[in-house]
Amino acid sequence: MAPDDNIPIACVLSALTPEQREREGVLLREHMASVQEVREHDDGFTFRYVADPALFVRMAELVALEHRCCPFLTLQLEWSRGQQAVPWLNITGGARIKEFVRSTFTPTPR
């Protein structure tokens, strides 16, 4: 068993101030509204956004807040090189947390 397999699957509610928690909610709603594509993996999900620098910065803020309150998640926001590249957010953590990621970060079909 890897050392990280022992990280509890529990949000650390005290990790964020009330203002940060409110901001997290705003950013999470924006994430849900902005996702263009979802890819499912064995250990989590990947979400594609439009190529908008301002959105990328806000999603980086969401990643920072989620990392503080959900240390059991692996969060990776990337925007590869090239004119046609778009940002992707990869949220993983193993099979144990996949349903949490699905229910928390995956938008319902429109």
State what each model feature region is.
Residues 1-57, 76-110:
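Secretory/periplasmic and organellar redox-cofactor proteins
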Residues 60-82:
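Amphipathic, hydrophobic secondary-structure cores in small proteins
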